[in-house]
Amino acid sequence: MANPPSRYDLTGRTALVTGAGGLLGKQHVAALAEAGARVVVTDLALTQAETAVAALKQAMPSADLNAVEINVTSLDSVRAASERLAGRGVTVDILVNNAAIDPKVTSAPGVMHSSRFEAFPVPQWQTEIAVGLTGAMLCAQVFGGAMASRGRGVILNIASDLGVIAPDQRIYRQPNVTREEEQPVKPVTYSVIKHGLIGLTKYLATYWADHGVRVNAISPGGVFNDQDPAFVERLTRLIPMGRMAELDEYRAAVQFLCSDASSYMTGQNLVMDGGRSVW
C-alpha cells in the first residue's frame, strides 16, 4: 500500500491559480507550492501577480512561482496566456478558478442603495458575473480542454458557503439606519455566482469524466481578517463552531482536492464553513 502522505505530493505538476493576488488566492498558491507544485500565479495586472509572488517568496523562498497576467473575462487573454506558457514548455495540470469580485457590504449613501436588489445596476451584475463565472468557464475551456486532450487534469472551483445557502442579511443590518430600504445588504451577484460555480463543477465533472479530468469545488466560510467586531459577533452566532476561519485553514483541503488523495472524487462540493450551512 502506498504511503498515504505521498498521495498529496504535487511534485512535477504545474498549477495555475486565477485571482492569485487576493487574500485567499495567495493561500491557494501557498498550499499548492507546499505540496511541491510549480504554480503559475495569475491576476488581472502583471504587477498584482508579481507582488503576490514577491510576498509568497519571502515565506517560501524555494517555491517555484511564476507571475502571469490574465484577464479571465477575455477568451483572447486566456488563450494568449496559455500560448505563452506552452512556449516556455509549461503544461497546466491543475486549474484553480479563484478569480472573483466580492462586493463589499456598505452603508455609504448611494453605494448602499445600489447594492439592494431593487436598484442593483445591470452593468455591475454583468461585470461581476463576467469575472466570477464566465471567467471560470473560459479558463476551463482553454486549460481544461487541454487537460481533456491529454487525458489527465484537475480543476478546482472556489465557491463559497453562500453558494450553498443564501446570505443572512440580518448580520449586515445597522442599528442607526431606520428605513428598511436603506439597510445595507450583501449584493445578489456573489451568491448567484457561487451557486453557478457549483453547477459548473457538476457539469464539467460529468462532461470530462471519461477524459481523465476531475472537477470539484470548495465552499469556504468567512475568513477572519480584522472585520468589524460587531459583524464578527453576529456572524459567529450562525456558526456552530463559534468562530470564523483562520486564513490558512483551507490549505489542506486545496491540497487534497488537487492531488491524488482525492483520485476517486469528482463533481463534489466540499463545504468548510464551521457548520454554518447545516444549522
Language-model features: where?
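Short C-terminal tail/terminal secondary-structure segment
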Residues: 2-9, 114, 174-177, 255, ...
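Amphipathic alpha-helical dimer-interface segment in Rossmann-like NAD(P)H-dependent oxidoreductases
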Residues: 83, 87, 100, 122, ...
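Short, small/polar-rich loop/turn modules that mediate ligand/substrate recognition or access, typified
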Residues: 209, 214, 265-267
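Canonical Rossmann dinucleotide-binding motif of NAD(H)/NADP(H)-dependent dehydrogenases/reductases
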Residues: 7-40, 204
